[in-house]
UniProtKB/Swiss-Prot annotation:
One BP term from GO: L-arginine biosynthetic process
Assembly and binders: Composed of two chains; the small (or glutamine) chain promotes the hydrolysis of glutamine to ammonia, which is used by the large (or ammonia) chain to synthesize carbamoyl phosphate. Tetramer of heterodimers (alpha,beta)4.
Binding site for Mn(2+) 4: E820, N822
Role description: Large subunit of the glutamine-dependent carbamoyl phosphate synthetase (CPSase). CPSase catalyzes the formation of carbamoyl phosphate from the ammonia moiety of glutamine, carbonate, and phosphate donated by ATP, constituting the first step of 2 biosynthetic pathways, one leading to arginine and/or urea and the other to pyrimidine nucleotides.
Region described as Carbamoyl phosphate synthetic domain: 532-914
Binding site for Mg(2+) 1: Q285, E299
Record's protein name: Carbamoyl phosphate synthase large chain
Length: 1054
């Protein structure tokens, strides 16, 4: 069928900020769709609130709105742009839910907007648990015994009939949000209440648990002519009961018989037809009885999903790109497979390799919370590896995780992060395969593979022969693993391996198991004879990606890597990407000239460098992971482009950096280092409390804390870290009541371009990644900004920075102090690039290639609007965690608000981050003693806006003494309706609560947790409360209803 000519413009809704369950895979999918539709000649309009995405780059769509993903905002975009169609299947659950909301509100009908990809009835049939169950029964497929309930008593009634355990699955949610396993009546009541709160339609499915059965997923595509293809089968190593996003998964499925696979395949085709997804992709999940052939249908996602991205990377079949073309009328047989250039998309991919995905977790950021894995997703990222066998891909994936395995404490009989390591330990201890299977329900096939690895470990000899090394490498053993088995250092093993002439070859991902030659250079390493790499005629430059997403190192760094790749190609170089993250745009097969899906270890990177012989290697865009390899690459003779490893060390070594600041006459907070607990106490007393304590060389504020006295310091030293000469404890004077400032800059070694100055909204003490910030600054005078720019230039030139750098300062009054310098891309690079219109990573890439800033002449758009970045947190996923901000980073993503006023931008950013400020109602204020005086102005501001002010007894007394009436709310547990009761019954609309005690049982902790559970905005800093006041004023004035495209903003401000 020809492409549709009755539509000219298409609106795409993105997925918003990175959250657990909805991450970088939707930037990858959305970017593919935007490009595909523009190539077809359609006008593409994009709405997304996440500035760290490639899809929100102004060239990806014709019109780009960085606005909150709320129905009223998207409706305003529709009113302004009048698109002919809406494609909602590429923005995750967020976009799907918005499409339903817009349809039910009559917006799509009012403006004549057609829905592409999936109809409203098909979305509802797939997402509403009861409708889905009825649909499956209609076509004769079994689902676990279940019932959709809308109240706790209904769930209790079902439990009496079918017993425990039960699975709770809310409707229209993502990543298992609100889902759980209930083992008894009390757990059921709590779980159903949580699930009803999580579901936008307040319904949950309560179903009989099939925990222990095997879980499989099929990625299915269908076109308007009713052609259906199965793109990929995926098997979960962990059994049912663990969310698929938290399970190790393998593609293609390894333990299905042909009969079982054909049964699932037939069922999947019947399901996609029954649900009515007429064009595009869907993910369908099954539970298969490990003792037979019977199976249940678990659920279906009628859209591109997290597994779709994995399947695309595993097979080379670009699901999102093809889904976009199917949505505008093409059929599968009319679309050419980009990988081969010779086969149509109606050919199902065939794999002659095995792909393994392992999730990456961040439980260490949330101490005190249970690490037991359930149906609610907890992982923050993932790695993928490709090998010729399952063992090879598993060991490569384990090497890609970038975790300290000695810190892992996993139990065999409890689903937990990295349980695979417990399986290995059990095998090493002599436990047999049947016993491990009994304890884990992991299929014996996978346990046997682990047993072969353990047996090979034991057979490693002190003298390694070429054949033995080659065989072990074929199994997937890294040089580090061989070193651990043989007792030699990894460098020695590497030297022996090279002396024996044992090197990897590289195979292409071609979608057809070698039947047709691959045109797109997408490679993985293995130890076989034939090498399939075809180098181009252009000189090449290697870009190291950032590896798995994690808190502190997320999509922002992938954004910089993608920009580097684009710019290298624009400058006539072959861009060679090395990365292990299947979610991201950087691992799309056509982002770079050649893609190597490999772990970011010295061994794997050096082998690619050996094969490619590049002009240089770029490390500075991928965060801390690539920087750790700088010295080893330099020793191996690789040319590191940009800032030298020596300069990197100068900036990151606290003592050396402190000496440099003193030489330059740049003020800085007093600090000290300690190698023992006693030294830490001595340094803290010398500096004077409060102090900030942390280990050296950390990312994302890991194990960083503000301590206010000896007792706090003792608790920190006992629970968190102990110093040593190799890893000293850093102790800094904490700068109370200072404002933190971030600066992103590019240096060519002679000149420095200041990309932007960002003022944090929270005071110093909150990690920069967790603080909201605004550019241009709102309280810094021009003279202060000039001094900050001067300090930044002097630091860049003195350190020897070539490329990107980020400097952090604290400011109070007329005082400016430097606190940190990172000679690499920062997490604010995408945000400041979107705010100013200057793509800093592209500019830095040109500098790395030897060009000069004076010739490039970057020109930011003159300031006409404020841009606010607001963080997004996963606190709802981690029970018992205090949602209090501090020096350790815990946010997973960010949203951005743009408006001519600061208040409007801040309100938009908060709304986009999931915190909608109320325009009226009741505000509860309860602050620490040190904040009570300043809280008077805040409370008066709310009263002036018409809010009723409620307060704790102590805070109310101060407010009344200053002439401000405030109703006293009783202390928790002392009779009468306390604030917890008020929150539960919806009697408070906004909370301002600053901490006043250490530990998890203070009243403040209980208030913050209860507010989180009931989605009441809770602000934990007075600076944040002051900004919220301005945001509420902007909402009342109607300023947040206006929308602005990036293209219009840039055109108006140049």
């Amino acid at each position: 069928m020809p492409r549709r000519d009755d539509i000219r413009s298409i609106l795409i809704i993105g997925s918003g900020p990175i959250v657990i369950g909805q991450a970088a895979e939707f930037d990858y999918s959305g970017t593919q769709a935007c490009r595909a539709l523009k190539e077809e000649g359609y006008r593409v309009i994009l709405v997304n609130s996440n500035p760290a995405t490639i899809m929100t780059d102004p060239e990806m769509a014709d019109t780009t709105y960085i606005e909150p993903l709320r129905a009223e905002t998207v409706a305003e975009v529709i009113r302004r742009e009048r698109p002919d169609a809406l494609l909602p299947t590429l923005g995750g659950q967020t976009a799907l839910n918005l499409a339903v909301e817009l349809s039910e509100a009559g917006v799509l009908e009012e403006y004549g907007v057609q829905l592409l990809g999936a109809s409203i009835p098909s979305i509802q049939k797939a997402e509403d648990r009861q409708l889905f169950r009825e649909a499956m029964e209609r076509i004769g497929l079994r689902v676990p015994e279940s019932r959709t309930v809308r109240s706790v008593p209904e769930a209790e009634e079902l439990a009496e009939r079918i017993g425990f355990p039960l699975i709770i699955r809310p409707s229209f949610t993502l990543g298992g949000t609100g889902g759980s396993v209930a083992e008894d009546l009390d757990a059921l009541r709590a779980s159903v209440r949580d699930g009803l709160d999580a579901s936008p339609v307040r319904s949950v499915l309560v179903e009989r648990s099939v925990a222990g059965w095997k879980e499989f997923e099929l990625e299915v595509m269908r076109d308007l002519a009713d052609n259906v293809v199965i793109v990929c089968s995926i098997e979960n190593v962990d059994p049912m009961g663990v969310h698929t996003g938290d399970s190790i998964t393998v593609a293609p499925a390894q333990t299905l018989s042909d009969r079982q696979y054909q049964s699932l395949r037939t069922a999947a085709i019947r399901i996609i037809r029954e649900i009515g997804v007429s064009t595009g992709g869907s993910n369908i999940q099954f539970a298969v009885n490990p003792e037979g052939d019977d199976f249940y249908v678990i659920e279906m996602n009628p859209r591109v999903s997290r597994s779709s991205a994995l399947a695309s990377k595993a097979t080379g079949f670009p699901i999102a790109k093809i889904a976009a073309r199917l949505a505008v009328g093409y059929t599968l047989d009319e679309i050419t497979n980009d990988i081969t250039g010779a086969t149509p998309a109606s050919f199902e991919p065939a794999l002659d390799y095995v792909v393994t995905k392992i999730p990456r977790f961040a439980f260490e950021k949330f101490p005190g919370t249970s690490a037991r894995l359930t149906t609610r997703m907890h992982s923050v990222g993932e790695v993928m590896a490709i090998g010729r066998t399952f063992t090879e891909s598993l060991l490569k994936a384990m090497a890609s995780l970038e975790i300290e395995t000695r810190d892992i404490q996993a139990r065999l009989d409890e689903p937990s992060p990295y349980r695979i390591f417990a399986v290995f330990e059990a095998l090493r201890a002599g436990m047999d395969i049947p016993e491990i299977y009994r304890r884990t329900s992991i299929d014996p096939f996978f346990i046997a593979a682990a047993a072969r690895i353990v047996a090979a470990e034991g057979a490693v000899e002190e003298t390694l022969s070429a054949e033995q090394v080659r065989e072990l490498k074929r199994m997937g053993f890294t040089d580090e693993a061989l070193a651990a088995c043989s007792g030699y250092p990894a460098e020695v093993v590497r030297g022996v391996r090279r002396a024996l002439g044992v090197h990897p070859t590289y195979k292409a991902v071609d979608t057809c198991a070698g039947e047709f030659p691959a045109r797109t250079p997408y490679y993985y390493s293995t130890y076989e004879q034939e090498d399939e790499v075809e180098r181009g005629e252009n000189p090449s430059v290697v870009v190291l990606g950032s590896g798995p997403n994690r808190i502190g190192q997320g999509i922002e760094f992938d954004y910089a890597c993608v920009h580097a790749s684009y710019e290298l190609k624009a400058c006539g170089y072959d861009a060679v990407m090395i990365n292990s993250n299947p979610e991201t745009v950087s691992t799309d097969y056509d982002t770079s000239s050649r893609l190597y899906f490999e772990p970011l270890t010295a061994e794997h990177v050096l082998e690619v460098v050996r094969r490619e012989r590049p002009e240089g290697v770029i490390l500075q865009f991928g965060g801390q992971s690539p920087l750790k390899l700088a010295r080893e690459l330099e020793r191996a003779g690789a040319r590191v482009l940009g800032t030298s490893p020596e300069a990197i060390d100068l900036a990151e070594d606290r003592s050396r950096f402190g000496r440099l600041l003193r030489e330059l006459g740049i003020p800085h907070p007093r600090f000290g280092t300690a190698t023992t607990a006693a030294e830490a106490r001595e340094v803290a007393r010398r500096l004077g409390y409060p102090v900030v304590v942390r280990p050296s060389y950390v990312l994302g504020g890991r194990r960083m804390e503000i301590v206010y006295g000896d007792e706090d310091l003792e608790l920190y030293l006992r629970s968190s870290v102990s110093g040593s000469p190799e890893h000293p404890i850093l102790v800094d004077k904490f700068m109370e009541a200072y404002v933190e400032v971030d600066v992103d800059a590019v240096s060519d070694g002679e000149e420095v371009y200041i990309g932007g100055i960002m003022e944090h909204i929270e005071e110093a003490g909150v990690h920069s990644g967790d603080s909201s910030c605004v550019t241009p600054p709102i309280t810094l005078t021009r003279s202060l900004q000039e001094r900050i720019e001067d300090y930044t230039r002097r630091l860049a030139l003195s350190i020897g920075v070539v490329g990107l750098m980020n400097v952090q300062y604290v400011v109070r009054g007329d005082e400016v102090m430097a606190i940190e310098c990172n000679p690499r891309a920062s997490r604010t690079v995408p945000y400041i690039s979107k705010a100013t219109g200057v793509p800093l990573a592209r500019l830095a890439t040109r500098v790395l290639l030897g060009e000069k800033l004076r010739d490039l002449g970057p020109r930011p758009a003159s300031s006409g609007s404020f841009a606010v970045k607001a963080p997004v947190f996963p606190f709802d996923r981690f029970a018992e965690v205090d949602p209090l901000l501090g020096p350790e980073m815990r946010s997973t993503g960010e949203a951005m608000g743009i408006d001519p006023t600061f208040g409007g931008a801040f309100a938009k950013a908060l709304a986009a981050a999931g915190q909608r400020l109320p325009e009226s109602g009741r505000v509860y204020v309860s602050v620490a003693d040190r904040d009570k005086r300043a809280a008077v102005l805040i409370a008066r501001g709310f009263a002036d806006l018409g809010f009723e002010v409620l307060a704790s007894e102590g805070t109310a007394g101060v407010l009344r003494n200053n002439g401000l009436p405030a109703a006293v709310v009783p202390k928790i547990g002392e009779g009468g309706e306390d604030v917890l009761g008020l929150i539960e019954r919806g009697g408070v609309d906004l909370i301002v609560n600053t901490p006043w005690g250490r530990g998890s049982r203070t009243d403040g902790y209980l208030i913050r947790r209860k507010a989180l559970m009931h989605r009441v905005p809770c602000i934990t800093t007075l600076a944040g409360a002051a900004a919220a006041l301005q945001g509420i004023e902007a909402r009342i004035r109607g300023e947040t209803r206006r929308v602005h495209s990036l293209q219009d903003l840039y055109a108006a401000r140049t």
